[in-house]
């Protein structure tokens, strides 16, 4: 990622309180409240992995909420070192979303937050397969939403940002997942929409229900 990646990390150097303020201003609800609504069935000792944890702000918020078994992978060393300094009790390692270095079903929750939007369409199915493989129960996401896949120019660069219906992609790719909850979050100042979604894996595929 080089200098571009470092600039991304520096732009996203937020505290959980600052993140809550950002969400409140943009969506009219805090990130903490969304987390509480979506994770109410997830115990605080659940093993949770964030794929693409950057500086660890999402994990730090989960830690403040009482979650104690936190893990993260991040491909960029600059961001990872800062995440480790903020989260000394979490297990954070350098790795790619294309090849998560953990066993099948190792985590109770695997999640992304603003990460799938940066995965090239040609790699998206593979990344989703890795997320699905490592989760034994829950897949949680917060990503840009669009009913149709679309590329978005990103700070003067092409082929770096896309939006689509990521929850639907999971449902179409995996027969054993059920969409438990989704909230479409409309921006207060423009027409953009983001989506938070929670999917559950079922050992018996007959129990899985998606749209």
Regions found by a protein language model. Give the residues of each.
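Short catalytic micro-motifs in class I SAM-dependent methyltransferases
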Residues: 114-118
